[in-house]
């Protein structure tokens, strides 16, 4: 059984929601990524998304774009990230998901990327710019390696939700707003109605992401989903320029507060 399925099964049995956290691999540097993953797992992260830095991240707002650029400026490349995931796997069995742009996979080589991801212990992929028309091909290849292709749906894509989710696995990433990622003070989408629509088409666990910046927002949205995804608000704390031990403490404090409300 894939680690993602196991995790949602355990959480359901405990009556809890998943805390899914996003960080950019290689920001502030690749070795610190290792420390951050272990630190946030320790205080309650259930699934961790590792963003593979990309020069033109269309789905990302300024916080994650800047984070991606910092990692690129450090020279972080896919082989470095594979190596650090392999290192994480010696210490941790937490579900790990790459958030990766399709062009990065294509340039690296689809087969090579999937094989290496499987070998180091990646459980799933979120590909925000994957055209629906090309989804089938990569889905078939990912299946061969036991890697889940996690569907990404948005409030504007009601007529496409069925198509997007029908072959997805793991969980549905439900984008809470139209536009790009980024911490927000409020979310204007009618979340209850939106999640009902998604539930009409799939029984997979559903996690809400984009714009969740505070424990209060997470608490407000948890009743409509099986999990909450927090990215930009966490990346902001990593980027604040603390020394390493202070940064890790700040990140752990934030994640533990989020976990408490779920």
UniProtKB/Swiss-Prot annotation:
Superkingdom of the source species: Bacteria
Active site, UniProt feature: 49, 60
Keyword field: Amino-acid biosynthesis, Aromatic amino acid biosynthesis, Lyase, Tryptophan biosynthesis
Regions annotated as coiled coil: none
Molecular function (Gene Ontology), one example: tryptophan synthase activity
Reaction equation(s) it catalyzes: (1S,2R)-1-C-(indol-3-yl)glycerol 3-phosphate + L-serine = D-glyceraldehyde 3-phosphate + L-tryptophan + H2O
InterPro entries the record matches: Aldolase_TIM (IPR013785), RibuloseP-bd_barrel (IPR011060), Trp_synthase_alpha_AS (IPR018204), Trp_synthase_suA (IPR002028)
GO CC annotation: cytosol
Keyword Ion transport tagged: no
Record-listed E.C. numbers: 4.2.1.20
CDD domains from the UniProt entry: Tryptophan_synthase_alpha
Pfam families in UniProt: Trp_syntA
Recorded metabolic or biological pathway in which this protein acts: Amino-acid biosynthesis; L-tryptophan biosynthesis; L-tryptophan from chorismate: step 5/5
SUPFAM superfamilies: Ribulose-phoshate binding barrel
Subunit structure: Tetramer of two alpha and two beta chains.
Family to which the UniProt record says this protein belongs: Belongs to the TrpA family.
Function: The alpha subunit is responsible for the aldol cleavage of indoleglycerol phosphate to indole and glyceraldehyde 3-phosphate.
Name by which UniProt lists this protein: Tryptophan synthase alpha chain
